[in-house]
């Protein structure tokens, strides 16, 4: 990928994130972490960086607009997504990547789509962006994070299992609903409920 294209994407993403500097720093952290993981695990570093850079491009869209746009663009909305519309930023972000940011690579768009819940049998790029979102350096310290950061460079599947487990626990402890796909991800990567 050409540096001019990457710089243009960075500028567009910064604008899309409503000048939320913390969100932008998180986004850069995910992009850089994705590229590092790609280098370690033998994936395409440019694709990983772009997917990481665009993973939250629909995050600042108000929830009612997320729902309206998903309907308008023919993107299916599950019951849990209606109840927790923030989950739609992944699906809508993949759509934006393709139609606003002109990303033609389906693998990049799929990595954006699945970065929140994960899914069973993810591609390597999907795994990379999913776990990079969890471990990037700007994340506040949460129980088990340092262990996951150590494991991910040796065993990305184990890191996915542990991060999914932590996410499920966090959502349960806070009385939030859990997307069934998060549970399927956890179980596929070795978790036992």
Regions found by a protein language model. Give the residues of each.
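Generic alpha-helical secondary structure signal
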Residues: 9, 28, 99-100, 174, ...
């Amino acid at each position: 990928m050409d540096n001019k294209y990457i710089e243009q994407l960075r500028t567009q993403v910064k604008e899309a994130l409503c000048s939320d500097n913390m969100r932008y720093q998180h986004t850069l952290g995910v992009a850089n972490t994705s590229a590092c993981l790609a280098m370690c695990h033998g994936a395409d570093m440019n694709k990983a960086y772009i997917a990481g850079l665009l993973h939250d491009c629909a995050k600042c869209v108000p929830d009612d607009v997320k729902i309206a746009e998903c309907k308008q663009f023919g993107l299916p909305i599950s019951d849990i997504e209606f109840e927790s519309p923030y989950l739609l930023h992944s699906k809508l972000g993949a759509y934006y990547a393709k139609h606003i940011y002109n990303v033609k690579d389906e693998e990049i768009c799929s990595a954006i789509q699945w970065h929140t819940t994960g899914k069973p049998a993810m591609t390597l790029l999907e795994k990379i962006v999913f776990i990079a979102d969890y471990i990037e350096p700007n994340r506040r310290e949460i129980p088990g994070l340092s262990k996951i950061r150590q494991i991910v460079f040796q065993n990305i599947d184990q890191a996915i299992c542990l991060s999914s487990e932590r996410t499920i626990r966090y959502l349960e402890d806070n009385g939030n609903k859990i997307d069934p796909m998060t549970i399927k991800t956890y179980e596929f990567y070795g978790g036992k409920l």
